[in-house]
Amino acid sequence: MGLSRLGIETAYIGKVGSDEEGRILLADFEREGVSTDFVIRAEGRSGTAMIFVDEKGNRAILVDPGVNDTIAYDEIDVDSARKYDLIHLTSFICKNGLDSLNSQKRIVEEFDSVSFDPGMPYAERGLGDMEKILKNTTIFLPNRQEIEMLFSEDYRTAAERCIEMGIEIVAVKLGSEGCWIKKGDREVTVKPVSTKVVDTTGAGDAFNAGFLYGYLKGKDIEECGRLGNFVAAKCIEKYGAREGLPRSVD
């Protein structure tokens, strides 16, 4: 949704249940200009999340994945999805099975450009379980805790290992310290945008949207980092993961 607001043609691959939550989710995507052509409708509950925010804007999330964990590879229209320039992956909870994770391990082989944000659910699964996805990743977008958990090393050393695995760009989110990016032998640190923190929900995804916007527009990695920090800063100025997402980077 963050990329769609910035004018990038986007589509969502996922699964929703036959309930009101699923209907609301699809309506939200369509209202924001995100194609739902690849959304699978199924019997059962849609995934939901309860988000708790403290007085400092920090948050905790309780997730019920519902049918989200049950996306079989054969349910995805991969041929039609290939028209998009990039596919972005993030973590499933894997509480109700490994179908969705296993589908991700297959679909990464079908695209030339893959971006991947592991989230804590995948970081906790360990490097062995994530290796196939990582070896097919173009842009890796972890935060510091996630990459250090995956590789059991500091983030700079871990990023070097990522490059050795064939990943083109590693962009590590450092929270209030901004971000650190590595591409080949080049390393840059990009300072954060000063802002008033209201709610950190969605900050990582907002950064991803800004960074990938820059990448898709052919920007230098440092400018991609600035765009990521900018979109994340706008996001955390308001409550919720979407309310603050900008419609322009100007």
From Swiss-Prot:
UniProt cross-references to PROSITE patterns, sorted A to Z: PFKB_KINASES_2
Assigned EC number: 2.7.1.-
GO terms of molecular function: kinase activity
Pfam families from the UniProt entry: PfkB
Stored InterPro entries: Carboh/pur_kinase_PfkB_CS, PfkB_dom, Ribokinase-like
Keywords: Kinase, Transferase
Family statement: Belongs to the carbohydrate kinase PfkB family.
PANTHER family associated with the record: RIBOKINASE, SUGAR KINASE
Protein name in UniProt: Uncharacterized sugar kinase AF_0356
Organism: Archaeoglobus fulgidus (strain ATCC 49558 / DSM 4304 / JCM 9628 / NBRC 100126 / VC-16)
Taxonomic lineage of the native organism: Archaea, Methanobacteriati, Methanobacteriota, Archaeoglobi, Archaeoglobales
